[in-house]
Amino acid sequence: MNESILEKYGENLTQVKYLVNPAVARDKELKELVMVLLTPEKSAVLVGKPGIGKTAIVEGLAYRLQLGDIPNALRGYSVYKISTPSLVGNYDGENRVMALVNELKTKDKIILFIDEIHMLMGASSQGPMDLTNMFKEGLSRGTVKLIGATTVDEYERYILRDKAFVRRFEKIDISEPTQEMCVQILMRTVPKLESQTGVRLPYTDFIKENIMKFIVNMTSEYKRVYEISSRYPDIALVVLRQAFSAALYDNKNQVGFKHIYEAVKSTKAVYLDVIKKELVVFKEMFKDELEQEGVIVEIPE
């Protein structure tokens, strides 16, 4: 295969333009990840529930590489995120993965991020792939470093039984952010959403932070729809993004409280009785802003 697997199925995260640090409030996990990458012949696997920001931590690593805020031993490395489903698609997963392995033998200073790495463990038609053996040459030379990511359930189901993988890959537990951390994450996400949509959130930092606190509180654990099984920060980010979408739908270049209200009342992330209660809080918490903008909050029966 002559084409580059890295270029076709991967994304160079070190070439992405980051408006803000993608890994807000994740310094502890980032340090742990960097320490593993600095350990000879060791790779890392990030393990945590869906939607808690495992990919954001790897993006945070790429961001630090861009800034040069990284130990000298890792300077000059590129971080590639590879699309796992595309590697195992069309029943030729073995060919594509082997082509990737062979390509990496010719590369230097590559950090390969494989999300949903458990999918590759079962990609072979003749049983689980021995990923540690396949990447062994690059790992031994120290020129290729691997980061995997998976959920707690998939780690226990697929990975724990592969003793060679467990020896090579240091497990890094990624916890759900606290409410305070999630507020920080949402605040730092606003510039990115403004850039993506061309729509501004035009309030003072004090009002913005109160908006984020409200969104985070209304999507706290026991208020979430169980079947969605999403966590902080994703479940809160969904509501924030919906407010920006509502402004775009209205052909506005600013997010107003009308759009935040629409996002809150229409969210599928929390139960209907929660929405009713939270709208009462919303109406009182932002009373002055709602009156100023002429927004009437109706509480569903």
Please tell me what each predicted stretch does.
Residues 1-301:
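AAA+ P-loop NTPase nucleotide-binding core of proteostasis motors
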